[in-house]
C-alpha cells in the first residue's frame, strides 16, 4: 500500500481524532474501465467512506471534504456530506462562505459550488453579503450564467430588488452588448414588478439612447421586443418615431422590429429585407413574408 499522502495525513490527524480504517473503492473483480485516480484523491475517498460510515462530523471530516473538493469539485456526494457536517455543527458555518470565496474563482462555473452557497445562505440569511459577492464575480466574468442564476435566487428568496436597476446600469455602461445584463434588467422591471423607482417613459428614453449609441446591438433590440410584448405598441410610438428619424430607413434591426410593431406592414417589410437589405438570407425573409400573410 502506498504511503499516505502528506497533506491528507495532516488533515486526518490520527493523534487528535483517533485511528480510521479506510474503505477502498470496490470496482469488482474485473472492472471494465477502472478510473485512474491520483494517490492522494484515492486515499482521501477511502477515508471519506470510513468517515461517512461512522457518521463523523468533526473538523477533520470537514477538512477532508475540502481536500476532496479541491481535487474534484463536481463530487456532489462530498458536497452533500460537507453540508451535513455544517448543519450538525453550526459553529463551523461562520467561515464557510469565506472558504467558498477563496475557491469561487477557480470553480466559478461549477454547479455544486453555487448550490452549496444557496444552502449555506439559507442558514445564515446574510444575503447582502452575497449580493456584494456576485458583483465582485461580475468583475471577473459579467456574463457568468451561474452567478446570474445565484443572484436571481437571492432576489427571489429575500425579496430585495433595490440594487438591480443600478447594477444593470453599471454593467451596461461598461459593456453595452452584455446580453446577460439586458436579460436581468428585463426580468426585474417587467417580470417581477418589484422595482418601484422607475417609469416606462424613463426606461424607453434609456433604451432609445442605448440603441442610437449602438444601432446594431441585437441585445437592445431584443429588449425592445420584450417591452413591446409587455406594454403594447401604442406606448412605443414616440420611441419608434425617434428611431425612424435617427436611423437609416433600411437599417436591418429597425426593419425587423417594425415588422412586429406594425403587423399590417410586415409582409412589405420582410420583402424589403429579402430583396434589398439582407439578400443572403432572402429565403428566410420570403418565408417570413408568406407567413405574415397566409
From Swiss-Prot:
Q: Name one Pfam family in it.
A: PPTA
The kind of enzyme this is, by top-level EC class, is transferase
Required co-factors: Mg(2+)
Reactions accelerated catalytically: L-cysteinyl-[protein] + (2E,6E)-farnesyl diphosphate = S-(2E,6E)-farnesyl-L-cysteinyl-[protein] + diphosphate; geranylgeranyl diphosphate + L-cysteinyl-[protein] = S-geranylgeranyl-L-cysteinyl-[protein] + diphosphate
Looking up SUPFAM superfamilies in the UniProt record yields: Protein prenylyltransferase
- Which EC numbers characterise this protein's activity in its record? 2.5.1.58, 2.5.1.59
Q: How does it assemble?
A: Heterodimer of an alpha(cwp1) and a beta(cpp1 or cwg2) subunit.
Function in brief: Catalyzes the transfer of a farnesyl or geranyl-geranyl moiety from farnesyl or geranyl-geranyl diphosphate to a cysteine at the fourth position from the C-terminus of several proteins having the C-terminal sequence Cys-aliphatic-aliphatic-X. The alpha(cwp1) subunit is thought to participate in a stable complex with the substrate. The beta(cpp1 or cwg2) subunits bind the peptide substrate.
* UniProt protein name: Protein farnesyltransferase/geranylgeranyltransferase type-1 subunit alpha
What organism, scientifically named, is this protein from? Schizosaccharomyces pombe (strain 972 / ATCC 24843) (Fission yeast)
Upper taxonomic classification of the species?
A: Eukaryota, Fungi, Dikarya, Ascomycota, Taphrinomycotina
